[in-house]
Amino acid sequence: MAQIGRGEMTDDTHGGGLDWLLDELLCRLSRADRAIVLSADGLLIGRSSNMSRDEADQLSAVASGFQSLSRSTGRYFGGGAVRQTVVEMENSFLVVTSAGSTAYLALIAAADADMGMVAYEMNLLIRQVGTYLSSRPRGDVQMTGAGRGS
């Protein structure tokens, strides 16, 4: 697992004050490795400092795709709104959770991670900064308010 350090953030980070919160989340979850926040359409909003921009963009695209498939499945089969998508792989989990009205928190955790604690900590972070995590889709051309561009 990668070592997490606050001094590793690069200049192209767009998460502002969000990135350090993702780092803190990973510090609380010893078996979690990477975390991002993304918009519903896959735009990267913030990333943990142990991720390169390219790696975070890739995870953002994957997480957005899984959430889209999950939402479609929920609608088609009457399952309702998607609260969380979990992908179990041989060596890790991908967990994607709704974070605000149009944003998601995605996290990679080791296969032996305590998934109850992962879900708890992710939801705790979302409750603490929920309105900050909300994001407008890129395609919304009627966006109003100064300084809210992507």
Annotated model-derived regions:
Residues 2-34, 41-150:
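Acidic, low-complexity cytosolic segments
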